[in-house]
C-alpha cells in the first residue's frame, strides 16, 4: 500500500508578505502588478472573503474589495523560501514531485521517520516548515496520489486530512467530479449533461460506457473513480512547451499595435529558451490573444526554430477572429520535442 502526502502552502506569496510586513497581516491583501489591468497571483484569506481570487484583474478585485492592498511580487524571496521548504521535505523522503513553488507530492511509503506513519510525517513536516519559515502549510494524506491532493484542501488553512485505505471507496463514491484534478469547468459541464456528477455515477456507468461516450478521458476518469489509478511521484519531468505573455495596461486597438509587441515578447521567449537549453528542441510556434471581452484564441504552426515572420502570420490569423475587438493580452510560445535526454530534474525553483 502506497503512502502519499500532498503539501500545499497556505496563500503562499501573500503569507510571505504578511510575515515580512506585519502591517499587512490583518488587511485584505493580494499580490500583483500595480496597473489596473494587471492580474493577481494570489490573495490572502481576508481578501478571499470578498470574492477576490487569483487570476482576477486588479480592477475587478478592487470593485469587489475597495480596501484591497495590492503589492508587487518578490519572486526571488519566494524562491528562497521555497528552497527552505524543499529542504524540509528532503529530511523525510527523496521521492518529491514539486508542482509549483508552494506545492508538492511526497511518497513516504518507505520512510522510517515517525515510525512510518504518513499522518505523523505530514504533521511533523508542517511543524518543521513553520519553524523554518514562519509559514503554515496544509496536507492531504492518502494511499492514492490524486486523493492526497484533494484531501489537502479539506482542512485549510493550517490543517491536514487523512483518507485511510478502508475509506477510499466511500470517499470516491461521494466525490464531486469537479474536485478531481484534470476535470475543469467545461469538462464538468459535459459530464453533467451525461448525468455524471459524482464518482459513484461514473462507476455505475462502467468503463465500456465511459469509453464509448466520453472517450479515452472517460477511461482514465473511471479508473480514478474506481480507485484503480494509484499514481506515482515523478522526480523527473519533460517540458512540453514554453511561453511568455503580457497583459497590457491599455488595450491594443489594431493589428499593427499588436505586431509592435512581438519583438519584446520574442526576446523574452528566446532568453527563457536559452536558459533552459531548449533552443534546438522547438517543434511548434504558437500565438495567444485575449480580447477585451475576455475571449481567448490561439494559432500555431509546426516549425523547428523561432521565426518572427511566422509569429507575425499567426498573430494576424488570431487577431482576425476578434472582429476588430481590442486586445488586452498577447502571448507567444513554442512546443518542445519529447526527447528523454532533455528531461529536466524537478526543482521547486523551475516550476
Curated annotation (Swiss-Prot):
InterPro entries, A to Z: DNA/RNA_pol_sf, DNA_pol_Y-fam_lit_finger_sf, DNA_pol_Y-fam_little_finger, DNA_polymerase-Y, DNApol_IV, PolY_HhH_motif, Rev_trsase/Diguanyl_cyclase, UmuC
Record has Magnesium as a keyword: yes
Enzyme class: transferase
Cofactor note: Binds 2 magnesium ions per subunit.
GO molecular function: damaged DNA binding; DNA-directed DNA polymerase activity; magnesium ion binding
Domain of life: Bacteria
Subcellular location(s) of the protein: Cytoplasm
Gene3D superfamilies named among the record's database cross-references: 3.30.70.270, 3.40.1170.60, 5' to 3' exonuclease, C-terminal subdomain, DNA polymerase, Y-family, little finger domain
One Gene Ontology term, aspect cellular component: cytosol
PANTHER family assigned: DNA POLYMERASE KAPPA, DNA REPAIR POLYMERASE UMUC / TRANSFERASE FAMILY MEMBER
Protein name, as recorded: DNA polymerase IV
Organism encoding this protein: Pseudoalteromonas translucida (strain TAC 125)
Lineage per the UniProt record: Bacteria, Pseudomonadati, Pseudomonadota, Gammaproteobacteria, Alteromonadales
Amino acid at each position: 500500500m502506497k503512502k502519499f502526502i500532498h503539501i500545499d502552502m497556505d496563500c503562499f506569496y501573500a503569507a510571505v508578505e504578511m510575515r515580512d510586513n506585519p502591517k499587512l497581516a490583518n488587511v485584505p491583501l493580494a499580490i500583483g502588478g500595480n496597473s489596473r489591468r494587471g492580474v493577481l497571483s494570489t490573495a490572502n484569506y481576508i481578501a478571499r472573503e470578498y470574492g477576490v481570487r487569483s487570476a482576477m484583474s486588479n480592477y475587478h478585485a478592487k470593485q469587489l474589495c475597495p480596501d484591497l492592498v495590492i503589492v508587487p511580487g518578490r519572486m526571488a524571496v519566494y524562491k528562497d523560501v521555497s528552497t527552505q521548504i524543499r529542504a524540509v521535505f528532503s529530511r523525510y523522503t527523496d521521492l518529491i514531485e514539486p508542482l509549483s513553488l508552494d506545492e508538492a507530492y511526497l511518497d513516504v511509503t518507505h520512510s522510517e521517520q515517525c515510525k512510518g506513519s504518513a499522518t505523523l510525517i505530514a504533521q511533523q513536516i508542517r511543524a518543521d516548515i513553520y519553524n523554518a519559515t514562519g509559514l503554515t502549510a496544509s496536507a492531504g494524506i492518502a494511499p492514492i496520489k490524486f486523493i492526497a491532493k484533494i484531501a489537502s484542501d479539506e482542512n485549510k488553512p493550517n490543517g491536514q486530512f487523512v483518507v485511510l485505505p478502508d475509506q477510499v471507496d466511500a470517499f470516491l463514491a461521494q466525490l464531486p467530479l469537479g474536485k478531481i484534478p484534470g476535470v475543469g469547468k467545461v469538462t464538468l459541464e459535459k459530464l453533467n449533461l451525461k448525468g455524471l456528477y459524482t464518482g459513484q455515477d461514473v462507476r455505475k456507468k462502467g468503463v465500456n460506457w465511459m469509453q464509448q461516450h466520453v472517450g479515452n478521458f472517460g477511461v482514465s476518469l473511471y479508473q480514478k473513480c474506481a480507485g484503480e489509478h494509484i499514481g506515482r511521484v515523478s522526480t523527473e519531468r519533460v517540458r512540453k512547451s514554453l511561453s511568455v505573455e503580457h497583459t497590457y495596461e491599455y488595450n491594443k486597438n489594431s493589428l499593427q499595435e499588436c505586431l509592435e509587441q512581438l519583438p519584446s515578447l520574442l526576446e523574452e521567449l528566446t532568453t527563457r529558451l536559452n536558459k533552459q537549453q531548449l533552443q534546438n528542441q522547438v517543434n511548434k510556434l504558437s500565438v495567444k490573444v485575449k480580447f477585451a471581452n475576455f475571449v481567448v484564441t490561439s494559432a500555431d504552426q509546426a516549425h523547428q526554430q523561432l521565426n518572427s515572420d511566422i509569429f507575425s502570420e499567426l498573430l494576424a490569423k488570431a487577431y482576425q477572429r476578434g472582429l476588430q475587438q481590442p486586445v488586452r493580452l498577447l502571448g507567444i510560445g513554442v512546443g518542445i520535442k519529447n526527447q528523454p535526454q532533455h528531461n529536466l530534474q524537478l526543482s521547486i525553483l523551475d516550476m
